């Protein structure tokens, strides 16, 4: 019998500057060590933190950029099975409507950069981001979609659409 994997709940926040470039973090720690990713982090489940509260907190902690819940649009919820073979993730993906004004200073988790969407296609990013999260962002960032992804190691990521709001 395969041992059960833990389930983690987290947010990703897609931030842009006024030029439409995306803020990404070159991660210096797992998960996603050594690759570029949107900012985010785990919910503080012990205090009953909501995904919106977590997105606001993580944005402030990682970038120093102050946002409010009404600056956020929840555009996707994705259940990732067996991510990196380590755990399952329930991810809430937010687009921040408020442009970030400047590149944040480096933090313990890594260093920041602004990138156009075309430049991101050439960056070292997690395979799940390349094949699932960024295509989801491109297609649904102004709507809402619920998906699940099988991220088992050694196999291509399989994404299944479970629900979508009408356009």
Please describe what each predicted stretch is.
Residues 1, 75-83:
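Short, solvent-exposed loop/turn elements at beta->coil junctions and helix N-caps
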Residues 1-23, 43:
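Conserved N-terminal beta-strand and adjoining loop/helix that marks the start
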Residues 8, 38, 67-69, 86-91:
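Short connector loops at helix/strand junctions that flank enzyme active sites
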Residues 19, 80-103, 130, 134-140:
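Active-site-adjacent beta-strand/loop module that shapes the phosphate/pyrophosphate-binding cleft
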Residues 66-76:
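A short coil-to-beta-strand element that immediately follows conserved catalytic motifs
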Residues 95, 104-136, 157-167:
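NUDIX/MutT-family hydrolases
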């Amino acid at each position: 019998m395969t041992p059960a994997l833990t389930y983690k709940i987290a947010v990703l926040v897609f931030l842009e500057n006024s030029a439409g470039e995306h803020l990404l973090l070159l991660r210096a720690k797992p998960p996603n060590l050594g690759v570029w990713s949107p900012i985010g982090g785990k919910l503080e489940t012990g205090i009953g933190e909501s995904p919106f509260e977590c997105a606001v907190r993580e944005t402030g902690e990682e970038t120093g950029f102050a946002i409010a819940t009404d600056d956020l649009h929840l555009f996707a919820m994705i259940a990732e099975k067996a991510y990196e073979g380590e755990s399952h993730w329930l991810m809430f993906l937010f687009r921040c409507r408020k442009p970030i004004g400047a590149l944040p200073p480096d933090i313990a988790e890594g260093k920041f950069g602004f990138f156009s969407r075309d430049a991101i296609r050439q960056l070292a990013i997690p395979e799940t981001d390349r094949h699932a999260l960024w295509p989801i962002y491109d297609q649904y960032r102004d709507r809402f979609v619920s998906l699940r992804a099988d991220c088992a190691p050694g196999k291509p990521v399989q994404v299944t659409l479970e629900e979508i709001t009408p356009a």
